[in-house]
Amino acid sequence: MDVLFEDNAPLSPTTSSLMPSNGDPRLYGNDLNAGDANTSDAFNWTVDAENRTNLSCEGCLSPPCFSLLHLQEKNWSALLTAVVIILTIAGNILVIMAVSLEKKLQNATNYFLMSLAIADMLLGFLVMPVSMLTILYGYRWPLPSKLCAVWIYLDVLFSTASIMHLCAISLDRYVAIQNPIHHSRFNSRTKAFLKIIAVWTISVGISMPIPVFGLQDDSKVFKEGSCLLADDNFVLIGSFVSFFIPLTIMVITYFLTIKSLQKEATLCVSDPGTRAKLASFSFLPQSSLSSEKLFQRSIHREPGSYGRRTMQSISNEQKACKVLGIVFFLFVVMWCPFFITNIMAVICKESCNEDIIGALLNVFVWIGYLSSAVNPLVYTLFNKTYRSAFSRYIQCQYKENKKPLQLILVNTIPALAYKSSQLQMGQKKNSKKDAKSTDNDYSMVALGKQHSEDAPTDNINTVNEKVSCV
């Protein structure tokens, strides 16, 4: 211990030995009564190393000290965000696989849902982990400053793409209900992909000013060490263009679609003529019956049977609208708090408490991220095809098992037997009708003979003459 003391040092302690450079006292938990000596820097470092758990690190903004302060605590919010990230990535990968592998799901609406799942999956891969990292560092940006603008750009891009996809789905279904023939004729896979490309192009255009101006001026994307949009114009214009305007279009077209479906269903129930007219616009595959048989069936068909196909298609549309309505509702409910609070932070900048607004934004943004994880759960609960596909993919079965031959025979033989019995009954009825018709013919012949016997002989002679002439 002698090497730690200076030869001519006084025996009274100084403040430099027990006080940090910034003047704040630190409780080391050691009493230097024995000797009351002034320690050197080496002794100060030893005491600090033995008691570093008592450090407060106030005013210390260096990354090692900052990470030491926050990483030692149990961060339950970071754990919850990690669960959201895993659910988002895994669920949306299942949606992408289902639409890619299941032929039943390969239509325009599901292509939009697959593109929406891609946006949500990329949000879970590229945006959410960095946001979780900022939570671990006390909402301060731990990465290089140039990456802040890129991260905000990706966040706005994928969030805007989500609302744009839902808006496009709502518009596409409304057009399909209003003009089904034109929509079915021009709604090919290529056209669906062109619409998806247009959605992504609009989303990129809306979010592109963020990296353009943010990389030139850090003050637009940094505020007190936190990475966020600090420009009020960005916040206001971006909120309206990327959320509120598409939200208005989506809600209006969705309710117009519901109204049109209800109107068609009412027409199908009330007016038989309209049912017959609408039945020709059915998207279901036509049967292989000949035109003559279809004409004969249309003659003997009951009035209420004309609209069965149309009612079935309308029922399917209503079910699809129900599922999409749940997706729309959850998206709106989960993202509205963030955008409303974001606008309030700009409008009431002086009167609002910035700490409360910042805390609300940190919570509401993760509620919005949660909507990306909820969509696959909605598909699973309300769509049988998605549910069966997800269960097979989890079991590493990527192809649907075909029914064995026994099940095919069991399902087809009773139907064939029923049809054959119906044919036999029809033949018996036809034979009875033929027998009745022959009896009537015989009776008519007998009456004719009796009438001919009672007739005068001169008439018979004239008839014989006519027959001989023929």
Curated annotation (Swiss-Prot):
SMART domains: 7TM_GPCR_Srsx
Ranges per topology, Cytoplasmic: 98-111, 172-191, 259-321, 382-470
GO MF, one annotated term: 1-(4-iodo-2,5-dimethoxyphenyl)propan-2-amine binding
Sequence ranges on the Extracellular membrane side: 1-80, 138-146, 216-232, 348-355
Motif (DRY motif): 172-174
Residues flagged as site, Hydrophobic barrier that decreases the speed of ligand binding and dissociation: L229
Membrane topology annotation: Multi-pass membrane protein
Subcellular location: Cell membrane; Cell projection, Dendrite; Cell projection, Axon; Cytoplasmic vesicle
UniProt-annotated glycosylation sites, renumbered to this chain: N38, N44, N51, N54
Binding site for serotonin: D155, N342
Positions occupied by motif NPxxY motif: 375-379
UniProt motif PDZ-binding: location: 468-470
Domain of life from the UniProt record: Eukaryota
InterPro entries: 5HT2A_rcpt (IPR000455), 5HT_rcpt (IPR002231), GPCR_Rhodpsn (IPR000276), GPCR_Rhodpsn_7TM (IPR017452)
Classification via PANTHER family: 5-HYDROXYTRYPTAMINE RECEPTOR, 5-HYDROXYTRYPTAMINE RECEPTOR 2A
Function: G-protein coupled receptor for 5-hydroxytryptamine (serotonin). Also functions as a receptor for various drugs and psychoactive substances, including mescaline, psilocybin, 1-(2,5-dimethoxy-4-iodophenyl)-2-aminopropane (DOI) and lysergic acid diethylamide (LSD). Ligand binding causes a conformation change that triggers signaling via guanine nucleotide-binding proteins (G proteins) and modulates the activity of downstream effectors.
Protein name: 5-hydroxytryptamine receptor 2A
